[in-house]
Amino acid sequence: MADYPPAALRLVAALRKLPGIGPRSAERLALHLLSAPPGASDDLAHAVKEAKAQIKPCPECGFFSEEGLCEICRDANRDSTLLCVVEHAPDVLNFERSGAFKGKYHVLGGLLSPLDGIGPEELKIPALLKRTKQNKVREVILGFGTDARGETTALFLAKELAPAGAQITRLATGVAAGSGLEFVDSITL
């Protein structure tokens, strides 16, 4: 039975490592790249290399930046006493797209997971505690999901941040607008 050449199989395997890309999607993407006009795959390879070389975590908050502090941390119009803590850098974009948050962010780089060996030192929690005290933050919004790791991290941070005197706020959870109670699980109720 015939199969793709080894280089094509390596390309499919590399694409499968991307989040949300299964075997069929990886194969389709690989075939597209191999069938694309000359230079198209070079453009993609160059863009990936350039992004990896130029984009680094902001030293203040952990969001994406090309030049030292990110755009958000450099913005003097942002409320530096209002801090939203998120798991990963893309979470910042979700808040930004809402247009509702005018404070600053802190990216932890993950959530606490003792079973996986992820404690406060593996995340940017010490930097968060230091930043909260130094910047006299008055409110910290914990922008995590409600799964076990999100809840564990939120409880831990609430306890650790309490001495700083900042108000600790969680994201709203519950019944979605327009849905009836017959569709809501018992935990939400």
Label every model-predicted segment.
Residues K17-P19, L171:
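Short conserved micro-motifs on helix faces and helix-strand junctions that flank
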Residues P19, P38, A51, F63, ...:
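Conserved phosphate/pyrophosphate-binding and hydrolysis machinery centered on Walker-type P-loop NTPases
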Residues P57, L69, D91, L108-L111, ...:
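Glycine-rich, flexible loop/turn motifs
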Residues L9-A13, E27-L31, D42, H46, ...:
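Solvent-exposed alpha-helical segments within well-ordered globular domains of core cellular machineries
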Residues A26, D75-G143, D147:
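Extended interfacial segments that mediate partner engagement and assembly in macromolecular machines
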Residues A2-A8, K17, E27-V92:
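Cys/His-rich Zn2+-binding cysteine-cluster or related metal-binding knuckle/ribbon modules and their
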Residues K102, L129-L189:
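Long C-terminal interaction/binding lobes of large macromolecular proteins
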